[in-house]
Amino acid sequence: MISTACWRDCMPQTVNKQAVAAAFGRAARSYNQHAELQRQCGERLLEHARPGNALRVLDAGCGTGWFSQRWRAGGHWVTALDLSEKMLQHARENQAADCYLPGDIEALPFADASFDRCWSNLAVQWCSSLPLALRELRRVTKPGGQVLFSTLTEGSLKEVSAAWQQIGRSAPLNRFASLPVIEQAAGSLALTLAGYTLTLAFPDVLSALRSLKGIGATHLHQGRSNGMISRRELQQLEQVWQRDARGCLLSYQLVSGVIERE
């Protein structure tokens, strides 16, 4: 099993959980307007879920509760958990789940074997230790149940990196794990991974950048060393950003992960 120390060697960044929660809290009201990535990624992840009746489901990193609602509509009892109180408040207002709890995926506030399905759509990339997060999700899953998670992987947002490089700046992006690192993080857990690319298009660079901010994904683990984007920089980015007939592109390397709980 890969150690926490080794994970940090692979992904050298310290996650400030309060700052992450604050970033997503600021995005809570506008989140669903910008969450096409989360919806498409979650739909792909749902394809790996085994059917069942009246399941107890944990939505870990629930955000506004979009997929909590999907699970609940299927007749399942859903517990929504998130770092951000504001996200939970939004989920509660939408009656997305049956129970709402603030909490950290790396220290889940549940007894062993509490859930039939543990669902975490695009949340574990905000964890300090993926090995610990996966162990916690498995711990609270009942024997015969499933852990279903998705995350961003190495190579995501190549258009952002390339555009910033062309104007002589380093891209204000977090690092994401490679598939081999994710496999190592699972250790002896019964994990299967399915990787794929998802590309979204936007009418202009500002819209593309706003989509990142709108889902709360602008918090940098290494801090905001690059500051705000100036009008001149935005104009330069417009000139060099990769695009096609649909508009300015944002490409995500994604993975759906399934852990079968024996």
From Swiss-Prot:
Catalytic function, reaction form: malonyl-[ACP] + S-adenosyl-L-methionine = malonyl-[ACP] methyl ester + S-adenosyl-L-homocysteine
InterPro entries on file: BioC, Methyltransf_11, SAM-dependent_MTases_sf
Highest taxon, organism lineage: Bacteria
GO biological process: one example: biotin biosynthetic process
SUPFAM superfamilies to which the protein is assigned, alphabetical: S-adenosyl-L-methionine-dependent methyltransferases
Function: Converts the free carboxyl group of a malonyl-thioester to its methyl ester by transfer of a methyl group from S-adenosyl-L-methionine (SAM). It allows to synthesize pimeloyl-ACP via the fatty acid synthetic pathway.
Annotated protein name in UniProt: Malonyl-[acyl-carrier protein] O-methyltransferase
Pathway the protein contributes to: Cofactor biosynthesis; biotin biosynthesis
Family: Belongs to the methyltransferase superfamily.
UniProt enzyme class: transferase
Phylogenetic lineage: Bacteria, Pseudomonadati, Pseudomonadota, Gammaproteobacteria, Enterobacterales
One Gene Ontology term of the molecular function aspect: S-adenosylmethionine-dependent methyltransferase activity
Keywords: Biotin biosynthesis, Methyltransferase, S-adenosyl-L-methionine, Transferase
The enzyme's E.C. designation: 2.1.1.197
